């Protein structure tokens, strides 16, 4: 018998465990109070987390080790676990099943008396009943007592009482499927990456619990499994995977018997210059910290002070250290389990339980100091880093003092390169950061000088990910930027003095421009994160193309926009003749072309792994699958290759021959006396990209199995493949127009720059947001740090996804 089964047998979790405090209507009237923002997506995803948290609470109690979240094709979500199953008996007070009570009463559950659950994700009027109230419909399945139970709700109202639908079932657990209310949420489309991040977090925090995430919404079924036995130590290593740790992880696990508070802690110092501390209470992240974070910081400072005094190392230090110095380069995950946690708000972003502080501070101080004493070599390396941080802080202080003295003597504190705006109100003022004097000059001429300031940055911008704070302050470009913004950095940072509430990075659409943008984003993320949090940082989106037709001009953002323009400009004068009779025109033709565009994109993706032309001709003949290995497919295969050999624009023109083997097919391409071999493995046809393109080709199979003739403005073209159809329409669309591609902002004149990028009524801006801090931390460390291997792996993993590379 497993531990899970034993726990189930011991359980006293029944209908009597469910306590009720009533009402659901308030949830529908003010959903934001219970589930979070219903407009920005946070509340929508919190619906999933509320259900998942119930499963995790079962895991914390020792009754569950498997949780699955499935995003369904119809837009609903299913969350299932192998816990005890929600109680199904009739509730004595309510006269209905306990399951129905839990789903329809706001304050109902087994977490009030701390008998069924000693630890849970806290209690503030949220729960699965809120999910039910804010769903168009919800279905609940329970496996308990060797039976399967079912109940369905519409807008939180029970359709019919809980019923038994199957018996003699050897299974335990709960499954909730819900469809979010369209009337409540602005957008009901779930984001896979957001959910993935939270589930990974939960898997790290609950060692030994397997969490599956399945996305069935698209043809490509995506499945991710999270299972970690290393707990939060593995979490720290995951977060810091792109950095050099200077010692092995320090791990603390302790339980305070009197209060019932337990503490899990994993930390190490790395060679970076930034602290990264993640705090959790009962598996819920506190972005604003709280009593556990304050206790941790205090304990670490005490540990360093005590160790320096004990070892006599304090006599060798040049400068006194601060608490910030002790935490430079620290990476830590701090997780506490508290029986009755108290938070500052409904969102649980800050823990205010005062009883947590002494427990955490004493445990961290005792255990970490003990580790220092047992590992003197590693401890000295940590102390050396802290002393180096103190020295750098002192150097930075002197640099700031020097800057202040210079500024006091100057008539104007603003840098000479800055072309400032006339407005003094930050709320309407904009700062454009541009690369080089050339683009800066054009921008100065084209701007609205009332509200728009231009700051050209010339020369190499410092990578602050690899530089200490004092070196950063010595950088001309960074110094110019800080002065122009009107605010300082680090502890002196204050948004009150910020001179512009729109700070816009405007760089060229080439490799150099992308690099400069990445360097600036790194600076803002590391040293002015509040600028991002307040929504003040933006990225300009200058157009890539200008299309001129007669006297009219149009600017297009990217390659996709240009393609759409060329198709739309041609479609009204175009029709497709099928087998010399049927005509495809108007919306039907447009629908086909949209499918061909998607098919073309799939071909581009697959072409990184196998020849594009061969893939296309096989796919539209239903041969880009295992049917190609069947003997009866040989004639169709040869016919398909004959078509490919006869395509005038095909790069594989001349002669293409084929040789079948049991587990592979060889394609021989003869051209200009040279022979090139392309091999298609049988196992390759099972790859998702290959299966996807094979299945999608079926949607256009009927059309391309016919003899096709395209008529564009009375001119006829024979069509054999989807690519040929798309390319013909695009080429026809280019006739009579002029297309200009901009590689840099300097290629535009001031009027063009105003019209496309500066004019607030026409431009497109991307607002910079950080959805998940630890994921952003990993990306900046990987791409901008000095550890090569994670960056190499990142490039390898994502290289095939690059469609347009400007070299």
UniProtKB/Swiss-Prot annotation:
Site residues (Interaction with DNA), renumbered to this chain: 460, 463
Q: Where does this protein chiefly localize?
A: cytoplasm
- EC code: 5.6.2.2
For this UniProt record, the keywords arranged alphabetically read as follows: ATP-binding, Cytoplasm, DNA-binding, Isomerase, Magnesium, Metal-binding, Nucleotide-binding, Topoisomerase
Annotated binding of Mg(2+) 2, by residue: 508, 510
Q: Which cofactor does it need?
A: Mg(2+); Mn(2+); Ca(2+)
Subunit and partners: Heterotetramer, composed of two GyrA and two GyrB chains. In the heterotetramer, GyrA contains the active site tyrosine that forms a transient covalent intermediate with DNA, while GyrB binds cofactors and catalyzes ATP hydrolysis.
The entry's protein name is DNA gyrase subunit B
**What organism is the protein native to?**
Rickettsia prowazekii (strain Madrid E)
């Amino acid at each position: 018998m497993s531990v899970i089964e034993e726990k189930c047998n011991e359980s006293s979790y029944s209908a009597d465990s469910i306590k009720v405090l009533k009402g659901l209507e308030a949830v529908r009237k003010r959903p934001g109070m219970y589930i979070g923002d219903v407009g920005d997506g946070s509340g929508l995803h919190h619906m999933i987390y509320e259900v998942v948290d119930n499963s995790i609470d079962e895991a914390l109690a020792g009754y569950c080790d498997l949780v699955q979240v499935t995003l369904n094709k119809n837009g609903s979500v299913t969350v299932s676990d192998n816990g005890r199953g929600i109680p199904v008996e009739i509730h004595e007070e309510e006269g209905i099943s306990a399951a129905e009570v839990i789903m329809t009463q706001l304050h109902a559950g087994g977490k009030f008396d701390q008998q069924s659950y000693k630890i849970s994700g806290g209690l503030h009027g949220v729960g699965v009943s809120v999910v039910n109230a804010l769903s168009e419909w919800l279905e609940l399945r329970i496996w308990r007592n060797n039976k399967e139970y079912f109940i369905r709700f519409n807008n939180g109202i029970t359709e019919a009482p809980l019923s038994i639908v199957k018996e003699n079932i050897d299974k335990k657990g709960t499954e909730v499927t819900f469809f979010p209310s369209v009337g409540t949420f602005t957008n009901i489309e779930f984001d896979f990456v957001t959910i993935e991040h939270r589930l990974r977090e939960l898997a790290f925090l609950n060692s030994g619990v397997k969490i599956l995430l399945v996305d069935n919404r698209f043809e490509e079924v995506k499945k991710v499994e999270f299972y970690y036995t290393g707990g939060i130590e593995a979490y720290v290593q995951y977060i810091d995977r792109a950095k050099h740790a200077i010692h092995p992880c320090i791990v603390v696990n302790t339980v305070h018997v009197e209060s019932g508070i337990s503490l899990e802690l994993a930390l190490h110092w790395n060679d970076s210059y930034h602290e990264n501390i993640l705090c959790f209470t009962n598996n819920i992240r506190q972005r604003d910290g709280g009593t556990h974070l304050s206790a941790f910081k205090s304990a670490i400072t005490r540990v360093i002070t005590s160790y320096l005094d004990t070892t006599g190392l304090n006599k060798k230090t040049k400068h006194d250290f601060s608490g910030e110095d002790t935490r430079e380069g620290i990476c830590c995950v701090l997780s506490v389990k508290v029986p009755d946690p108290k938070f500052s708000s409904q969102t649980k972003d800050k823990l205010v339980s005062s009883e947590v502080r002494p427990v955490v501070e004493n445990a961290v101080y005792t255990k970490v100091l003990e580790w220092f004493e047992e590992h003197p070599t590693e401890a000295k390396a940590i102390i050396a880093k802290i002393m180096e941080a103190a020295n750098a802080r002192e150097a930075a202080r002197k640099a700031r003092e020097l800057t202040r003295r210079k500024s006091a003597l100057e008539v104007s504190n603003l840098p000479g390169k800055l072309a400032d705006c006339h407005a003094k109100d930050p709320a309407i003022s904009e700062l454009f950061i541009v690369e080089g004097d050339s683009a800066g000059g054009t921008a100065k001429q084209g701007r609205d000088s009332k509200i728009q300031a231009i700051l050209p940055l010339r020369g190499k911008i410092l990578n602050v990910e690899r530089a200490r704070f004092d070196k950063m302050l010595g950088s001309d470009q960074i110094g110019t930027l800080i002065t122009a913004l009107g605010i300082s950095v680090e502890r002196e940072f204050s948004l009150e003095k910020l001179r512009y509430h729109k700070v816009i990075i405007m760089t060229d659409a080439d490799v150099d421009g992308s690099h400069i943008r990445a360097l600036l984003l790194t600076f803002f993320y590391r040293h002015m994160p509040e600028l991002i949090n307040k929504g003040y940082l933006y990225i300009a989106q200058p157009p890539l193309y200008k299309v001129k037709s007669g006297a009219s001009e149009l600017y297009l953002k990217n390659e996709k926009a240009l393609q759409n323009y060329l198709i739309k400009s041609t479609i009204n004068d175009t029709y497709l003749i099928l087998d010399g009779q049927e005509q495809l025109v108007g919306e039907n033709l447009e629908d086909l072309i949209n499918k061909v565009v998607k098919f073309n994109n799939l071909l581009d993706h697959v072409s990184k792994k196998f020849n594009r032309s061969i893939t296309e001709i096989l796919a539209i003949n239903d041969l880009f699958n295992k049917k190609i290995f069947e003997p009866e497919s040989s004639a169709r295969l040869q016919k398909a290759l004959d078509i490919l050999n006869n395509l005038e624009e095909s790069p594989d023109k001349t002669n293409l021959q084929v040789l079948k083997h049991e587990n592979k097919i060889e394609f021989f391409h003869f051209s200009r006396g040279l022979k090139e071999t392309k091999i298609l493995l049988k196992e390759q046809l099972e790859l998702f990209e290959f299966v996807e393109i094979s299945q999608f080709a079926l949607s256009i199979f009927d059309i391309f199995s016919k003899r096709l003739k395209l008529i564009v403005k009375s001119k006829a073209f024979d069509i054999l493949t989807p690519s040929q159809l798309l390319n013909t329409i695009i080429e026809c669309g280019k006739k009579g127009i002029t297309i200009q591609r901009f590689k840099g902002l300097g290629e535009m004149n001031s009027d063009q720059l105003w019209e496309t990028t500066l004019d607030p009524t026409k431009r497109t801006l991307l607002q910079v947001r950080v959805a998940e801090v630890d994921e952003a931390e990993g990306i900046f460390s990987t791409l901008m740090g000095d550890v090569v291997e994670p960056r190499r792996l990142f490039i390898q993993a994502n290289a095939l996804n690059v469609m347009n590379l400007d070299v």
